[in-house]
Amino acid sequence: MTEANELAGKVQSDQAPASEKPEEAIKSRKLEWMQKYIHHPGLMIGLTILLLLVLIAIAAPVLAPYSPTDTDLGNTLAHPSSAYWLGTDQFGRDVLSRIIWGSRISLQVALAVVFISLTLGTIIGAVAGFAGGWLDRVIVVINDILLAFPGFLLALALVAARGSSLESVVTAVSIAFTPRVAAVMRSVVLTIKPRLFIESSRAIGMSPARILFCHIVPNAMPPVIVVATVSAATAILAEAGLSFLGLGVQPPTATWGNIISDGNATITTNPLISFSAGLCIAIAVIALNMLGDGLRDTLDPQMRRQTGRIL
């Protein structure tokens, strides 16, 4: 009798989720996703650091004690003090103020590059994988040619051809990273296209465009979002490298790359200028990589076991 009662209890517990209301099922699913995010330390640490950097960039006019372009030739290369927490550069500009304002440029470049490369790469990769045929072959050939060049080298050539400006940096880095997003999107679309729910959509007469953008693309976005997040970190490095070489945002605009370039002349006597900007770049890149790893583990747990790192 006891065993029968236990068996009946198990059956009732197994059948309980089936009788759950749709609203409760959606709520429980949202709670499950929130628990996954909260219990992933890397994702939370990366997201927290990134949010702090964004807040610092937004509040730069309030947080920065001085203007990033104001010079004081009577107080050049000053060591850290209560007036200048990180000292001054060879033009008497406050290093801390320039670093705070420089975060704006780096985050603007990262955000713009992610938006442009994610949009273009998603459309190009989705159309190539879904259409197939000669269009797919042409896109793959062009994509492979662009991928054959290192991303930074391609961005360097494009900036040199267009001229040094913030718009040129964003355009060049976006063009360099779009093929990577397109390649990932195409490969995921090819795995989703033969699935049963796609064939069922075709059978009921759904248009190809609706199938692609309403069913395939949303299901293919998780790995693409991860690639875009990691690309944001690479975009910050690319902008800093281009500015360091004098091909990025031009002085006296404060960027982390320009600060490193300015401090390079006094690296032996006052290394804090270059070190502080380099540390900010490292923190931002590490935070974005931690965020990308966390999103990968949360959105697609099998991706880490099957393919390792995406980039």
Task: Give a label for each model feature.
Residues 1-122, 126-127, 134, 148, ...:
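Gly/Trp-centered helix-boundary motif
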Residues 45-49, 109-113, 139-142, 155, ...:
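Hydrophobic core positions of alpha-helical segments in small-molecule transporters
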Residues 53-57, 159-160, 173-180, 230, ...:
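Alpha-helical transmembrane segments of multi-pass membrane proteins
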Residues 57-61, 155, 159, 226, ...:
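Structural signal for membrane-spanning alpha-helices in multi-pass inner-membrane proteins
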Residues 85, 89, 119-123, 129-195, ...:
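Generic hydrophobic transmembrane alpha-helix motif, especially the helices
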Residues 93-108, 112, 132-140, 190-194, ...:
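Amphipathic cytosolic juxtamembrane alpha-helices at the membrane-cytosol interface
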Residues 147, 158-162, 173, 188-189, ...:
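Glycine-rich helix-loop "coupling/hinge" segments at transmembrane-helix boundaries
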